[in-house]
A protein has these predicted regions:
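Exposed, low-structure sequence patches enriched in small/polar residues
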Residues: 463-465, 487-760, 766-778, 788
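Short Pro-Gly-centered beta-turn/loop motif in secreted/extracellular proteins
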Residues: 78-87, 311-317, 703-729, 741, ...
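Membrane-embedded beta-strand positions of outer-membrane beta-barrel proteins
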Residues: 166-170, 205, 237-239, 352-356, ...
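Structural motif
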Residues: 43-45, 58-64, 152-157, 276-284, ...
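Feature captures outer-membrane beta-barrel proteins of Gram-negative bacteria and organelles
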Residues: 157, 186-199, 219-233, 368-382, ...
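Extracellular beta-sheet/turn segments enriched in Thr/Pro/Gly and aliphatic residues
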Residues: 134-138, 342-345, 670, 733-754, ...
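Sequence/structural signature of outer-membrane beta-barrel proteins
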Residues: 171-179, 208-214, 242-248, 357-363, ...
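Post-signal-peptide, soluble extracytosolic/periplasmic N-terminal scaffold domains
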Residues: 2-12, 16-271, 581, 586-661
Length: 836
């Protein structure tokens, strides 16, 4: 078919490219009239036509960018022509090249935006792979910066665009009670989370409104703060209302200023504890490190002693199996035991937090006392981490010191001690101390995980900062309860999990106990959970027990047991539908049984569930409850509704949620915004799914939002090309972004909106346009196409009428066109054009 013939040129180019090591010569006479006026020398030497190509930029085989690159025709020392890419010094720096070490890169580039001289880097090469649309950059390892796992180069961090953004959610519920006194209750709830982004600054707020029954509605602000990243310090500065970090002391709500390290800005291997692998290589050797069967490190070392310090372990435990492959074919193998300490940092890594402000309790009647806090953690040699901190407030001072370390195969351990000096409102000054021990061990071979934490309160006067400050109130009321005045003497928590494989399932045990100093007895909490897969379904058993100490010394014990089973019905229904059954049996109250069917429809945009439950101890007829739930994941937000009915009551509810971004292009509505956000821009391509998120599609302009991006890391935002409108094409389906914390970054897709046409071109004298001539649509960037052997060219993104420019060698001509009234085969216009 004729409209496929333009592919001939790409085929010829591909053959030449793949065989450019050999001397091939194309017989121009085989092209007939199309050969007139065309120079075949470039094709004979395996070189493409110079111009702009959209390519994936590959550095040593790894894709680092996708962009339009200008290629110029140059000749090497032997006079052989080749296409040289125009890459700027700043672009090379973004790709990880140590541009500061090669000042000759600037020889041709007088400014950072001009083409750099890549030959300044010894043994560096750039090759255009036209078949795969790739620019292959081969850069010596010494000329590249060290790349770390879990973080992108700082040059790629993007603070995003100025924007106003807001999440909103609302729900209203109507409940009709039918038993005893009939009545109707209405409740409504609204939450707004507005924010502003300006440069690196992020301003955030959370405000809610609630009304229940006959009460009037009430607004309440949860927090307002401004923060930004200080990238040179790898830290964040926060001003306003927030909560402190809880690694050393308990988290404290405050209004003030906080400067703290941001782990997300630091490579995992530099901040997290990692073992040092030491050995001796007899020759130039390759060292391979495996953990849990996976290769986590591979490098080449020189003869002599070596120490590998930048390992990124894939799990929190698991021995490291090291193999040294010598150049003479011999190998060395040894094992390095490894466990992650409860608190552990990489050697030399410093983590800190500084806070000053006022205490911010959720109870508005609590005094806003001045507080200050400082914490410090530092990675020491010998697999140790030292940490400590101080807290100071009106009526309260505390200090803490601790040490964490690895015990090899025996697990990991950290121990810390704290001392407090405090005075509750209306009470005498108290002084106390506590010790905390944390132990963990993970046995990968048996699938066993064990964690234990033990607090020992050495004296009666130990209090936390919140214990003391919450007692000071300006309303004259003293919140006193007998439980608040109980003094714990110790507290223990443990967790044990055991995996027995796919068929036997997983078992988890949890437990905690609190012993009291001034009253006999203790509080206990235990839990057991087991789950497995059966024939594509799931089965789980859960048991929990809580024993709480009462004022008279007695205990109240509550047990609850539940059994849950789910089975997919897709083999019968042909879609994603499951049935479930659940039984819940508490020690107080009757047993409840529930059956349900749930599923998805419309490409996972619709979630639905139908449930029927029965409670044994309910009044006659009142134990049966029927419920229906529907949720729609739309391009402009989420919409849900539910309905439940029993003889005792009937309830209906509706909820909506979504996100709004106001930016320099306008307003974009979408699903709720989470974390850092990509503003997807595909002009003219409406209704196109983005990524794997149900319901996330471009709006009528081609815009949408995608949240939950990984900060300071490369994220790929993808369009589904199979869902593009008939008149739309994209030059690439993936865009890579590296957002900073809370940023709104642009993910721009280059679209061509318009008709597709196969045009036969002729010159004024009736002769054919030479083979390989370049055709561009005036006013359309990146629209170059090539003429085939039949003087035909395939064009996309055409308006109803316009102008084309045709170039070959030193000659050119122009074509004015107008689309025919009707499309041809496969929606393709077929027409002719006269080139003048």
């Amino acid at each position: 078919m004729k409209f496929k013939q333009p592919a001939l040129l790409l085929f010829i180019a591909g053959v030449v490219h793949c065989a450019n090591a050999h001397a091939y010569t194309f017989d121009a006479s085989m092209l007939g009239d199309a050969a007139k006026g065309v120079d075949m020398s470039l094709f004979n030497q395996g070189v493409q036509q110079p111009g702009t190509y959209r390519v994936d930029v590959m550095v040593n085989g790894k894709r680092v960018d996708t962009r339009d690159v200008v290629f110029k025709l140059e000749k090497d020392g032997q006079g052989t022509p080749f296409l040289a890419p125009c890459l700027t010094v700043s672009q090379l720096s973004r790709y990880g090249v140590k541009t500061e070490d090669y000042p000759q890169l600037w020889k041709a580039a007088k400014t950072p935006d001009e083409c750099a001289d890549l030959t300044a880097i010894p043994q560096a090469k750039a090759v255009l792979d036209i078949n795969n649309q790739q620019l292959q950059l081969s850069i010596p390892q010494l000329a590249l910066r060290t790349k770390f796992k879990g973080i992108a180069p700082e040059d790629l961090w993007d603070d995003g665009i100025p924007a106003f953004l807001m999440n909103y959610s609302a729900r209203t519920t109507q409940t009709d009670y039918k038993m005893d006194m009939e009545r109707r209750d209405n409740s409504s709830w609204v939450q707004l989370q507005p924010g502003i982004n300006i440069g690196a600054w992020r301003v955030r707020n959370a405000t809610s409104w609630q009304r229940s029954g006959q009460q009037s509605g009430k607004w309440q602000a949860a927090y307002t703060y401004a923060e930004r990243g200080l990238y040179s310090l790898k830290s964040r500065l926060t001003l306003g209302q927030k909560t402190s970090q809880g690694e050393i002391f308990d988290s404290v709500p405050f209004t003030g200023v906080m400067l703290a390290s941001d782990d997300n800005m630091v490579p995992y291997s530099e901040r997290q504890f990692a073992p040092v692998v030491r050995g001796i290589a007899r020759t130039q050797a390759r060292v391979e490190v495996k953990q849990n069967g996976y290769t986590i490190y591979n490098t080449t070392v020189a003869p002599g002693p070596f120490a590998l310090r930048d390992l990124s372990v894939t799990d929190s435990s698991g021995d490291l199996h090291v193999t040294v492959w010598e150049a003479d074919g011999s190998t060395q193998m040894f094992v390095v035991p490894y466990q992650t300490p409860a608190i552990a940092l990489h050697q030399g890594y410093l983590k800190y937090s500084l806070l000053a402000g006022r205490y911010r309790s959720s109870d508005s009647a609590t005094d806003k006392a001045q507080i200050a806090q400082a914490t410090l953690m530092y990675g020491l040699p010998w697999n140790l981490t030292a940490y400590g901190g101080i807290q100071s407030a009106t009526h309260y001072q505390a200090a803490l010191l601790g040490l964490g370390g690895s015990l090899g195969r025996w697990g990991s351990l950290s121990v810390d001690g704290s001392d407090t000096h405090s005075q509750r409102q209306g009470e005498a000054v108290q002084q106390g101390a506590s010790w905390r021990l944390r132990y963990s061990n993970q046995l990968t071979a048996t699938g066993t995980n064990f964690f234990l934490t033990r607090w020992q309160y050495a004296s009666q006067g130990y209090n936390t900062l919140s214990d003391v400050l919450d007692s000071y109130r300006h309303d004259g009321n003293r919140l006193w309860s007998w439980r608040e005045n109980l003094q714990p003497s110790s507290r223990t928590t443990l967790m044990l999990s055991q995996s027995w494989g796919r068929h036997l399932g997983n078992l988890s045990l949890t437990g905690s106990r609190t012993d009291w100093r001034n009253r006999p007895g203790h509080d206990d909490s235990y839990g057991l959970s087991w789950g497995t897969s059966i024939g594509g379904g799931s089965l789980s058993l859960n048991w929990n027990q809580n024993r709480t100490l009462w004022r008279n010394g007695a205990h109240r014990k509550e047990n609850i047991t539940s059994l849950w089973f789910s089975m997919p019905l897709s083999r019968w229904t042909g879609n994603n539908v499951s049935a479930s059954w659940q039984m819940t049996s508490p020690s107080h109250g009757g047993q409840t049984q529930q059956v349900g069917v749930n599923g998805e429809a419309f490409s996972q945009q619709l979630d639905w569930e139908v449930r029927q439950s029965y409670r044994a101890d309910a009044p006659p007829g009142g134990g049966n409850n029927s419920a229906l739930h529907l949720a729609w994941n739309g391009a402009y937000g989420l919409l849900g509704g539910d309905y439940s009915y029993s003889r005792a009551m009937r309830q209906m509810g509706v909820n909506i949620a979504g996100g709004i971004v106001i930016h320099h292009h306008g307003v974009t509505l979408g699903q709720p915004l989470q974390g850092s956000v990509a503003l997807v821009e595909a002009p003219g391509a409406s209704g196109v799914p983005v990524g794997d998120w149900p319901g996330v599609k471009t709006d009528f302009r081609g815009d949408t939002t995608v949240g939950n991006l990984s900060v300071y890391q490369e994220n790929t935002v993808s369009l589904d090309p199979s869902q593009l409108p008939d008149d739309a094409e994209v030059t690439q389906t993936d865009v890579r972004v590296v957002p900073t914390e809370g940023a709104v970054v642009e993910a721009k897709f280059h679209t061509r909106i318009g008709a597709r046409a196969l045009m036969t071109l002729k010159r004024e004298d009736g002769s054919a346009i030479p083979f390989g001539a370049q055709v561009t649509v005036n006013g359309q960037d990146g629209s170059a196409a090539l003429v085939d052997t039949d003087s035909q060219v395939y064009l996309t993104g055409l308006a109803d009428k316009g102008e084309l420019t045709v170039k070959w060698g030193a000659q050119q001509c122009r074509v004015n066109y107008q689309l025919p009234a009707h499309k041809g085969i496969a929606g393709l216009y077929q027409m002719s054009g006269l080139c003048r």
